[in-house]
Amino acid sequence: MATQRKSKSKYVPALGFDWLTPFYDAVVGITLRERTFKEALIRQAHLEPLQRVLDLASGTGTLAIWIKQGEPAAVVTGVDGDPVVISIAKDKASAANALVQFDCAMSDALPYPAAHFDRVVSSLFFHHLSWHSKVRTADELFRILKPGAELHVADWGLATNLVMRGLFFFIQLLDGFENTQDNVSGKLITLFEQAGFADVSQRQTFHTVFGTMSLYCGRKPG
């Protein structure tokens, strides 16, 4: 996930500053149990052949590439607002021989028709957005998903204990207190329900060195 550079939506780059973007993969891999929680997110999504899958705020492409490698017959698209990370993602996909389309667009104005995708997945993105931008983004995801399709999100959530809450303070210093407070207050479930999703729930949590990582899911009725 990365910065939406030309949007009225205002949020923070992946590691707080653009110059840190080249180090994103290494930092996430070392500190956040990336493979563990992303593989859990992929399993949670129950992907099937020929499904259209969107990785929202795909960043450097890791999740989208793993999805394609795990389900080669799926049609996988990644979208991000930062052309720099889109370029990195394309190079990574090419090196991995993974056929993934990467588009540059804003999360609250996605360039896809209504009822187009079977799954939307997203990792470590929503905590970068203001509440207003979270709402606009959730509405967009509801629009582009088919009836009966599903949303699966991995992001910071309500801390499971005081230690996890204390560790999350460092994320708030880096990414902003206003943007991240919705996550640590447990408001993502409310966000997705207000957008129209049904059966919204937190499915799993993971302890990391920076706090509690939560996996969410929701379904578009129909």
Where are the regions that the model predicts?
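C-terminal lobe and adjacent flexible extensions of AdoMet/dcAdoMet transferase-like proteins
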Residues: 215-222
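A short acidic, Gly/Pro-enriched loop at the edge of an enzyme's catalytic core
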Residues: 108-120
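C-terminal alpha-helical "lid/dimerization" subdomain adjacent to the S-adenosyl-L-methionine
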Residues: 8-11, 152-195, 200-214
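Conserved class I S-adenosyl-L-methionine
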Residues: 2-46, 62-66
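Class I SAM-dependent methyltransferase SAM/SAH-binding core
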Residues: 54-56, 60-109
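Short glycine-centered segments of the SAM/dcSAM-binding site in methyltransferase folds
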Residues: 52, 148-150
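A short SAM/SAH-binding and catalytic strip from SAM-dependent methyltransferases
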Residues: 119-132
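A short glycine-rich, Lys/Arg-flanked "PGG" loop and its adjoining helix->strand segment in the class I
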Residues: 135-147
